[in-house]
Amino acid sequence: MTAIAMPMPSANRAERHFYLAMAIAVVVAVLLGFARTVFLRPWFTEYAHLHAPVETWFYVHGTFFLLWIALFATQTSLMTVGKPALHRRLGALGAALIPVMLFFGTVGALIAARRPTGFFDVADPPLQFLAKPLPDMVVFAVLAGGAIAWRGAPQTHKRLMLLA
């Protein structure tokens, strides 16, 4: 009795489509998660008290973090369509973006903790509030840094990038 083996290109294609689907899911989650408080804030009356100007810092922070999400989706798309050379060139932008995100994420968390209403009306005490974003920055640094360190090992690299 002979076993029928699945051809490798098919398995590889399925894996690439899995990561593309995950990247799309991340984009959708970010858009839905921030729709009421950021992207569509003027249309949600329960957030009317948040229509006051938000510190520029948070817009800059959000821009860099959205850039990371867009870059992640682009990078995944490039590998799905078989463009690894462009993926590697854009990877340098991602590597440069990591310390910028760590800086803006950490300082943004510290600024939000000082606000009387917290960050978008999450009025937790400052130390309690910081228990979420500061460890998030450490985990992101470890995962993204690990992904860069293991970029020569595609299976490890792609998993770390997805988790970052």
Region locations from a protein language model:
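Hydrophobic/aromatic-rich structural module bridging two neighboring secondary-structure elements via a short loop
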Residues: 77-111
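Membrane-interface helix termini and inter-helical loops of multi-pass transporters
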Residues: 39-49, 114-124
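Alpha-helical transmembrane segments of multi-pass membrane proteins
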Residues: 26-43
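Short aromatic-rich membrane-water interface segments that cap or initiate transmembrane helices
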Residues: 49-63, 122-134
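Structural signal for the C-terminal ends of transmembrane alpha-helices
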Residues: 74-82, 144-152
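Central hydrophobic cores of alpha-helical transmembrane segments in multi-pass inner-membrane proteins
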Residues: 64-76
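N-terminal membrane topogenic signal
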Residues: 10-23
